[in-house]
Design a protein with these regions (language model features):
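A glycine/threonine-rich phosphate-anchoring loop and its flanking beta-alpha core
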Residues: 1-34
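Active-site segments that bind and position negatively charged phosphate/pyrophosphate groups
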Residues: 24-134
Length: 178
């Protein structure tokens, strides 16, 4: 559930990032607008939704989060052109998967959540990065490589970084990232 919320937040940031500067057809424009609800619902309800989940309750906050995870992301994924579905956050996730033990210890949405922070840093959105970092931390999604048990060693991270910048999710972004 927690990791699903991390992946849902990414839908908003990646859709807006990858669509930046493009003239969108109707369906992609509508999908991008729906992606706003992916982030807004999780930002608004995450804390209470996690509490309800922990108590085994299906209250309003839990329901709103589940709808964002399933309905909103599904609508966005099916409405926008494929090139607007993923960007740097997912590319970072797939790079992290190459590091031994990471995929076994963390869920996809955990890694994508961390990837959002990298995307925001690369894009120079420090104010938004701070807010998202705080949100992810409150959801117990890792916000540093250290929290994932990954050494900050350039040689060790080389394959991860290479995969992150050369993967298919990086083919349609507003500027080159190397």
């Amino acid at each position: 559930f927690r990791a699903g919320m991390g992946d849902t937040i990414a839908k908003y940031f990646e859709c807006h990032f990858s669509a930046r500067g493009d003239e969108l057809d109707y369906h992609s424009a509508l999908g991008r607008e729906i992606s706003n609800l992916c982030y807004e619902r999780i930002r608004t309800y995450a804390g209470k939704a996690l509490a309800e989940f922990g108590e085994g309750k299906a209250g309003e906050a839990f329901t709103q989060a589940v709808l964002a995870i399933t309905v909103n992301t599904g609508l966005v994924s099916h409405m926008v052109e494929d090139c607007y579905n993923c960007a740097l956050a997912h590319a970072v996730c797939y790079g992290l998967d190459l590091i031994p033990g990471v995929a076994e210890r963390f869920l996809h949405g955990d890694l994508v959540g961390y990837g959002i922070l990298i995307q925001l840093a690369v894009d120079g959105q420090s104010g938004t990065l701070a807010k998202v970092r705080k949100l992810l931390k409150s959801m117990e999604i890792p916000v540093t490589l250290k929290e994932m048990g990954v050494a900050l060693d350039k040689e060790f991270l080389r394959d991860m970084l290479k995969e992150s910048v050369s993967g298919p999710d990086m083919e349609h972004i507003p500027y080159p990232v190397t």
